[in-house]
Amino acid sequence: MAHNGVADVQLKAGSAYGMTVAVISASWNADITDQLHEHSIAAAKEAGAQVSEWRVAGALELPVAVAAACKRFDAVVANGCVIQGETEHFRVVCDAVTYGLTRAGMDSGTPVGNGVLTVDTHEQAVDRAGGVDAKEDKGRDAAVAAIHTALVLRQIERGV
C-alpha cells in the first residue's frame, strides 16, 4: 500500500519463505496497537514468513524485547502508540523508544520495522492504524520494511 511520503515497497507472495519474523507490540492504546499487530502479522504471513508474536505492556518495553528477538529472528517488527499528553513524558518516551529500536537493529544487524505511532491525537493514530477509512497502515508498512530490508541484506551478503 503506497502512501504519501512512504516508499512504494511491495513484497511478492512467498518472497519471505523460510524467513522468521517476530512481531512485538505494546498493549497500551490497545484499540490502535491491536490493529497494528494484526496487520504486521498478516503482511509477514502473506510474504511467506514464519511469524512469532508477543505483547509487552507499553512502548518503553519494546526496545529490550526487540533486542532479544533480534538475536533469533531474521526481521523484527515493533508496534506501539504514543499519544501526546500535557507533559514532557511524550517526548522522552518517543526519543527513548526510537533510539532503542534503532540501536537494537544496528547492534544486531537485524532489520527492525518501526511501527510505533507518535501522534498528537487519538484521531491521528486511527488514521495511521490501517482500519476502515484509515489513511495509512503503519503496522503493514513496518512489517514490509523489515522484511524487505532482510531480503536486501541477504542479497548484499551474497554479493548479488
From Swiss-Prot:
Keywords: Riboflavin biosynthesis, Transferase. InterPro entries: LS (IPR034964), LS/RS (IPR002180), LS/RS_sf (IPR036467). It comes from the Bacteria. 5-amino-6-(D-ribitylamino)uracil binds at residues 28, 59-61, 81-83, 114. The keyword Magnesium does not apply. Transmembrane segments: none annotated. It is an enzyme of class 2 (transferase). Its EC number is 2.5.1.78. The keyword Transferase applies. Belongs to the DMRL synthase family. NCBIfam families: lumazine-synth. This is 6,7-dimethyl-8-ribityllumazine synthase. The gene is ribH.
